[in-house]
A protein has these predicted regions:
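Basic nucleic-acid-binding interfaces
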Residues: 1-27, 31-74
């Protein structure tokens, strides 16, 4: 299992998820909701300058991705 870089911003996470087929559904305040239709997945990403590792792990889990897949999309 490879480590992900620390200090990823919400914008960087959003771009990586968009490369994986997610689209921005809506944004309200400091949170973005991204959705993929096939296979269905919906993820909430905080629009913060830095996302904690636990939050990032939860985002990857909800997206159905492993860290290596995500790293390739960065």
């Amino acid at each position: 299992m490879s480590k992900l870089p620390r200090g990823l911003s919400g914008r960087q996470v959003r771009r990586a998820l968009e490369r994986a087929g997610f689209r921005l559904r809506r944004q309200k305040g400091s949170h973005m909701v991204l959705r993929r239709d096939e296979p269905f997945a919906q993820v909430v990403v905080p629009a913060h300058p830095s996302i904690d590792t636990g939050t990032r792990a939860a985002i990857l889990d909800a997206a159905g991705m492993d860290p290596e897949q995500f790293r390739e999309l960065l």
